[in-house]
């Protein structure tokens, strides 16, 4: 005979005579043997004891139906089997509770890991979007800033355009200026030549001729 966990069950030896044991069990069930002509006592104590024995017998009957193989055992063996069976059920409940708690913790860890992964992905996407937007803004600002400058210096003959070109390429500006435009000469260089008729005609000896004039 084995219990639900596989451990052998050793029935306890009876210390009483079998007849005495059966008599005690019969008393527990129905109050023992009664003579056919005997009348039930109407004493309140006897009635209360009889009802108590009936309730005990009913509880034993229910317990025998719950314990595996209890209907084929005597009262003592059935009680021992009930004790082992209750311990086995308690151990099974403890194991199932531990497994359920472990499963719930694993689900919670998985949910937290998934939430962190989603948050990291969103953060990386936001950073990439910010970097891309900053590059586009810089390019747009450069284009917008260069456009007014080009409009301001777009006049080819204006002073601003010449100053810009001179600042960018002084040597080339000087060469281009020398090739296309020379500075004006001072007015003292140009001497107006006097009409030949105004000069006096002199001979070799320095004498004046009949022509009238002054040098």
UniProtKB/Swiss-Prot annotation:
Expressed in the boundary between the shoot apical meristem (SAM) and the region of new meristem formation. Residues 40-89 form the bHLH domain. Coiled coil: none annotated. Keywords: Developmental protein, DNA-binding, Nucleus, Transcription, Transcription regulation. It is found in: Nucleus. One of its GO terms (biological process) is regulation of secondary shoot formation. This is Transcription factor LAX PANICLE 1. The gene is LAX1.
């Amino acid at each position: 005979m084995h219990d639900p966990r596989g451990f052998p069950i050793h029935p306890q030896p009876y210390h009483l005579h079998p007849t005495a044991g059966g008599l005690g069990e019969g008393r527990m069930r129905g109050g023992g043997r009664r003579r056919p002509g005997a009348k039930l006592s109407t004493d309140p104590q006897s009635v209360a004891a009889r009802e108590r024995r009936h309730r005990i017998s009913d509880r034993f009957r229910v317990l025998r139906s719950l314990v595996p193989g209890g209907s084929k055992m005597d009262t003592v063996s059935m009680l021992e089997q009930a004790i082992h069976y209750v311990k086995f059920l308690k151990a099974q409940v403890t194991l199932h509770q531990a497994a359920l708690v472990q499963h719930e913790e694993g689900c919670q860890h998985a949910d937290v890991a998934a939430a962190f992964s989603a948050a990291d992905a969103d953060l990386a996407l936001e950073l990439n979007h910010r970097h891309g937007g900053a590059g586009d803004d810089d390019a747009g600002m450069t284009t917008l800033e260069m456009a007014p400058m080009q409009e301001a210096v777009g006049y080819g003959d204006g002073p601003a355009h010449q100053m810009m070109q001179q600042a960018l390429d002084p040597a080339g500006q000087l060469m281009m200026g020398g090739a296309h435009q020379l500075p004006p000469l001072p007015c003292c260089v140009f001497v107006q030549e006097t009409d030949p008729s105004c000069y006096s005609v002199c001979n070799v000896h320095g004498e004046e001729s009949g022509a009238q004039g002054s040098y």
